[in-house]
Amino acid sequence: MAKGLEKFNELVESFANLPTIGKKTAIRLAYHLCINNQIDGMKLAHNIENAIRFIKPCEQCGALSENELCEICSDEERSKNILCIVESPKDILTLEESQSYNGLYFVLDELNEEKLEKLKQILLKLNISELIFALTHSINSDATIFFIEDKFKDLNLTFSKIAQGIPSGVNLENVDLISLNKAMNFRTKI
């Protein structure tokens, strides 16, 4: 670290603590904001402060929101009878960007009694007919799906999970065996 530049070093360290930012990139960012474009630096600081102050989880689904209910839960045009369970609010951002789903969400970041009770209340209140699991594929997520299916089997729900298999453009030799196995076992007719 540069001697006598404590504030610069602190900024570099703050950037380097962010995911996917290494020390060289952190130095470039700090230099750009302090020397090359101080207006961008001030704007970034303001935007970070506002995001931290105003973004919170949606009361209903757990998505990122600036209000009690997020835009998705408030949207009258969305399918209100389908609920997609995800692990993180980031997953909602990804699914929304894909424009492949028009229902509601529920962030299941922890599997505990409080979350399960909240999920049950939403299922009943909104008269959900289908529960879609969009979880990272693993033995733990399979166990979670099985547990939730069993817990809510009396609610007359259709349970489904997102398809999995081989990504586009990937050679078979580069696919892990679990994904290849699932792709073969859950193949679709053409």
Curated annotation (Swiss-Prot):
Domain annotation Toprim: ranges: 81-167
GO MF assignments: DNA binding; zinc ion binding
Coiled coil (residue ranges): none
Residue spans, zinc finger C4-type: 58-73
This protein's record includes keyword Hydrolase: no
Domain of life: Bacteria
Keyword set includes Zinc: yes
One GO process term, biological-process aspect: DNA repair
Short name of one Pfam family: Toprim_4
Xref: Gene3D superfamilies: 3.30.60.80, 3.40.1360.10, RecR Domain 1 (1.10.8.420)
Protein name: Recombination protein RecR
Species: Campylobacter jejuni subsp. doylei (strain ATCC BAA-1458 / RM4099 / 269.97)
